[in-house]
């Protein structure tokens, strides 16, 4: 009897261990840039507006996240060419449309030109006034500048580790073309000097996207989870939490 009891206990423990493994949430790679307040990697439990929403959606859909942050052009390439890999925030545009599975928009973001002393009203005016414009390499902003006819000599694609706000403050570039909340957030951490913002010249949704080859069930679950987070007000609350205190102009 003792031997049977011992064997039974061993079997039960093995069964419980196997059950815990099989019931664990499957891990999915999530590629994000360090782009506060949209996505953050080094601020404790804070992951930024898009980061928090993406993680909440993944947890709700039954997935755990393995967060990765390679250089943004490489991140886009790896996700596009991979299988069942997630990426956020990603702007949906013509050049990217066929390369990804677009799960759902998380946030709408305005883009503008930022400078120390010149306000412009359009791409055309910016093209005539600014000699050198800093812009994130591999971003939708860089693509848009090229589509709007800016010369290569006017575009400064930022390298890894370069701080566009510092470059603008030191006069190394004339302007910075970027998302409004991100630019205000970074500038506020750097200086009290006024930052001159142009009229908003570009507005687009930021998506949670997946590899072109993506599990339809995962897409459906994540899409439903984001829809729920939008309807119950979670997305608005998270955005308000991160943008509180940022200058309006």
Where on the chain are the PLM-derived regions?
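Bilobed "Venus flytrap"/periplasmic-binding protein-like clamshell domains
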Residues: 33-36, 43-56, 117-152, 156, ...
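Short helices/loops that flank or line small-molecule/ion binding pockets
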Residues: 73-85, 101, 161-181, 189-190
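N-terminal signal peptide c-region/cleavage motif recognized by signal peptidases
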Residues: 19-22
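Extracytoplasmic small-molecule ligand-binding "clamshell" domains
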Residues: 25-94, 98, 157-158, 232, ...
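Ligand-binding clefts/hinges and TM-proximal coupling segments of bilobed small-molecule sensing domains
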Residues: 64, 140-159, 227-249
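Acidic, polar ligand-binding/catalytic clefts
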Residues: 55, 66-128, 138-141, 197-201
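Extended ligand-binding regions for polar small-molecule ligands
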Residues: 51-60, 119-121, 127-132, 139, ...
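Periplasmic-binding protein-like
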Residues: 32-34, 108-112, 188-225, 246-249
